Structures are given as C-alpha cells and as structure tokens.
Curated annotation (Swiss-Prot):
Pathway involvement of the protein, from the record: Membrane lipid metabolism; glycerophospholipid metabolism
GO CC annotation terms, alphabetical: cytosol
Protein name: Glycerol-3-phosphate dehydrogenase [NAD(P)+]
Source domain of life: Bacteria
Cysteines paired by S-S bonds: none
Gene Ontology MF term list: glycerol-3-phosphate dehydrogenase [NAD(P)+] activity; NAD binding
Keywords assigned: Cytoplasm, Lipid biosynthesis, Lipid metabolism, NAD, NADP, Nucleotide-binding, Oxidoreductase, Phospholipid biosynthesis, Phospholipid metabolism
C-alpha cells in the first residue's frame, strides 16, 4: 500500500472499530486500523484477526495494522473514529495536529460528552475547528454480525454533502451493508445516545421478570422520550423512526449481545451497579449516557421519566423494582402528551 492512498483510517481497534475496518476492506478498499496499544496491534498483525472480540473473522489482505498515530493519519484523508464517548474529545485533540490538510472526519461513537452532555458534533468542532467536514454513522449494528457479513443497515449524516456521498459509496455494499443517507445531523447523533439508556431499562424490566408486554411498552415510551428530546434540540421527527432511532433502539433493547441490556438485566436481578459493570467487563456506554442524557433533558426542559428512574438506580441507589413501580404509578396521561 502506498503511504498516502488508503480509503480510510480507522481510529479504535475494539470490536466495533475492527468490524467496520473489516467491512471496508472486504468492500475492496485499502484500510488502516490504528490502536493505542502497540502490543495489541502487534498481536492483531500476527494473528490477522481480533481474537479477543472477533476470533472467527480473518482480516482481508487490504486491512493494514498501525500503532503509530502519525503514520496512520497520513495514510488517508478520511478518518473514522470509533472510541468510547468519554474519550472522544481527548482523541480528537490528540489527532488534530497530525491530520492531513485535506482531512475529513466521521465517527461511529454513540453517546454524548461526559459531564457536559454536549452532542459530539460540538465536541468535534471545538477540537478540530470549523473547516473540517464532519459526519456520523449510527444504527442497529452488533460488531460480530457486521464482521461476519450478515445483513446490516445504518444511517449516515454529514455537514458536507460531498463527504456524505463519498462515505455512502465507500461503506455501502449491496450484498450485506446498506447505508442510508439522512440530512438530520443532530437526530442521527442523539438516537445512539438515548437508546443506550432505554436499553438498560429494558434489561432491568426483563431482569425483574416483567415479561414481553412491559418490555415493549418501555421501548415505545422510550422512543417517545427520544423524540421529545430530539424535537427540543431541533432534530427531525422522522429520524427517530429510522435506523438511528427505532432501529437501534429495538436491537439494543431486545438482544443479549447488547452490553447495556445485559447490564440492566443484572440490576433487575438485584446485582449492584459496580458488580454488574465488572461482570460485563467492557464499557457500558449507557451508564455514562444516562447521566448525560438526563443533564441534556434538564437543560432543555424535557421530561424523560424513564431516563430519570434509570438515573436514580444507577447513581442514587434506588432499587430497580422500586423504579419500575414509580413509573407504573405515575398519573394517567394522554399518550400523545409531551410528558
């Protein structure tokens, strides 16, 4: 591979970053995958697979491993960031001085900025300035299924139409990976954060043993909370009926591949928060997202009762069953009401 002709540099060699890199390479593109741990990257290069997360998926020949950040960023103008939301800003500040002058950045990170609850677009603009084209991809994607080439669909939104068109062409594969463009940059970002919170609630409900009726009601009312918050931020309502909204919400709330759902199930079964996190053994994005989404809702005056009760369980020591009973005991409402 020529040093500067890769189609994409992927920042983040976890399960999802690796799966996206594999998908791009499988589409015939030269891809560079960077990870912060040189030993981990050396192991990936030796094994030609990510044995820790995706042991049965060999790397295509066009997937190249790199532990030197400057070299990775020099390889392509297109940068795909796939890191946990709580380090998103830190990573962007790290890569900014090393990016090519023609660089364009897209992220698959789902969540909001830690502590502030800001959208990641605001974090990116603060870190990178106003000139770099930005984009986000989001939707119902489990890394193992994506890497295995099973049919998957996502949404793509960008501040730059040319970048959006180029990304759609790069990522889209008619055999297994559909990429839908969406002009709603805010909505596509927000859906991925809120669904993590609701998935914890769905897991709690199932952990308690409330059954399918309760789970479905929680998903539906969770979608209403997502839509209300989105409207307050200026998102398009239709976005939340698409891949980045309802699609990702249903997937994360109903399948045990979801760490957020499994985490919630443990809480519903009586496990404490710290023990549940330790048992999951990987980042549970919804834990931080709950605090951030709640902060955002308060800032914009949006009532989100499910989010509030999940927050009470995660951060205030409330029992999951008590939280569920609080929700069930709320005053009668019109289903179409704003609270």
């Amino acid at each position: 591979m020529n040093q500067r002709n890769a189609s994409m540099t992927v920042i983040g060699a976890g399960s999802y970053g690796t799966a996206l890199a594999i998908t791009l390479a499988r589409n015939g593109h030269e891809v560079v995958l960077w990870g912060h741990d040189p030993e981990h990257i050396a192991t990936l290069e030796r094994d030609r697979c990510n044995a820790a997360f995706l042991p049965d998926v060999p790397f295509p020949d066009t997937l190249h491993l790199e532990s030197d950040l400057a070299t990775a960023l020099a390889a392509s103008r297109n940068i795909l960031v796939v890191v946990p939301s709580h380090v998103f800003g830190e990573v962007l500040r790290q890569i900014k001085p090393l990016m090519r002058p023609d660089a364009r950045l897209v992220w698959a990170t789902k969540g909001l900025e830690a502590e502030t609850g800001r959208l990641l677009q605001d974090v990116a603009r603060e870190a990178l300035g106003d000139q770099i084209p930005l984009a986000v991809i989001s939707g119902p994607t489990f890394a193992k299924e994506l890497a295995a080439g099973l049919p998957t669909a996502i949404s793509l939104a960008s501040t730059d139409q040319t970048f959006a068109d180029d990304l759609q062409q790069l990522l889209h594969c008619g055999k297994s990976f559909r990429v839908y463009s969406n002009p709603d940059f805010i909505g596509v970002q927000l859906g991925g954060a809120v669904k993590n919170v609701i998935a914890i609630g769905a897991g709690m409900s199932d952990g308690i043993g409330f059954g399918a009726n309760a789970r479905t009601a929680l998903i539906t009312r969770g979608l209403a909370e997502m839509s209300r918050l989105g409207a307050a931020l200026g998102a398009e309502p239709a976005t939340f009926m698409g891949m980045a909204g309802l699609g990702d919400l249903v997937l994360t709330c109903t399948d045990n591949q979801s760490r957020n759902r499994r985490f919630g199930m443990m809480l519903g079964q009586g496990m404490d928060v710290q023990s549940a996190q330790e048992k999951i053994g990987q980042v549970v994005e919804g834990y931080r997202n709950t605090k951030e989404v709640r902060e955002l809702a308060h800032r914009f005056g949006v009532e989100m009762p499910i989010t509030e009760e999940i927050y009470q369980v995660l951060y205030c020591g409330k029992n999951a069953r008590e939280a569920a009973l609080t929700l069930l005991g709320r005053a009668r409402k019109d289903e179409r009401s704003s609270h």
